[in-house]
């Protein structure tokens, strides 16, 4: 059971976003997809979830084409875009999420909202940038999909909320082991969480190895 990218390439006009990327994300591991802004991280995840089409190459989720209903139902991507109506209240959005994700844990979502002090009766467009991110993370953790994809997940969060999120993420993983991919440029913050590291730079994979191996070799994203 895995996500498999085979020879993925993507260009935007004259800009190379991804070049011949082959990569596997296996179940039951926390991955770090690490790289500077513009390295190609978001493009890769958007191709996986059908928001972008590759120029060449294929993507499969547990053997099914990534753009199939069978595959998409196993994925949850937290990105910059909010997928709920701006004037919808947070509480109503949780109700909606429970309809689309059969394993959605509503009581857990409300528990997370309480810990993060997320106001359930506030409209989504009334949330600050930080609380907008918190809302998306609450839904993501409670959705319990087999593959959780987090693209710069702590955008706008203060230090306290970032640490609370990382702690909750690890607790959630320990209770329900699944494939989690953390795409970020904040390398130091996730170093103790990730088991396997993928380093991407200018659309190419530089390293794809267990985190311990790269740490022992003193690898850095800035290389």
Language-model features: locations:
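Helix-to-loop junction immediately C-terminal to a conserved catalytic motif
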Residues: 49
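Helix N-cap at the start of a conserved alpha-helix in ABC-type nucleotide-binding domains
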Residues: 39, 159-161
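Catalytic Walker B motif of ABC-type/P-loop ATPase nucleotide-binding domains
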Residues: 148-152, 157
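ABC-family P-loop ATPase nucleotide-binding domains
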Residues: 79-136
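The feature captures the beta-strand-to-loop junction immediately N-terminal to the Walker
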Residues: 31-36
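Conserved ABC transporter NBD signature motif
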Residues: 57-71
């Amino acid at each position: 059971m895995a996500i498999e990218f085979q020879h993925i390439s993507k260009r935007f006009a004259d800009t190379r976003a991804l070049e011949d990327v082959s990569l596997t994300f296996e179940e039951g591991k926390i991955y770090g997809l690490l790289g500077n802004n513009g390295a190609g991280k978001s493009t890769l995840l958007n191709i996986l979830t059908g928001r972008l089409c590759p120029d060449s190459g294929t993507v499969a989720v547990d053997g099914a084409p990534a753009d199939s209903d069978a595959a998409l139902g196993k994925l949850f991507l937290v990105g910059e875009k909010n997928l709920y109506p701006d004037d919808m209240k947070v509480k109503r959005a949780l109700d909606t999420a429970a309809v689309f994700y059969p394993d959605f844990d509503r009581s857990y979502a409300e528990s997370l909202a309480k810990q993060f002090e997320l106001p359930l009766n506030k409209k989504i467009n009334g949330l600050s940038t930080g609380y907008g991110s918190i809302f998306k993370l609450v839904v993501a953790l409670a959705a319990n999909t087999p593959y959780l994809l987090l693209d710069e997940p702590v955008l706008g969060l203060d230090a306290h909320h970032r640490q609370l999120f990382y702690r909750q993420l690890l607790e959630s993983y320990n209770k329900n082991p699944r494939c989690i991919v953390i795409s970020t440029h904040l390398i130091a913050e996730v170093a103790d969480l990730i088991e396997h590291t993928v380093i991407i730079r200018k659309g190419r994979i530089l390293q794809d190895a267990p985190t311990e191996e790269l740490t022992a070799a003193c690898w850095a994203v800035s290389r």
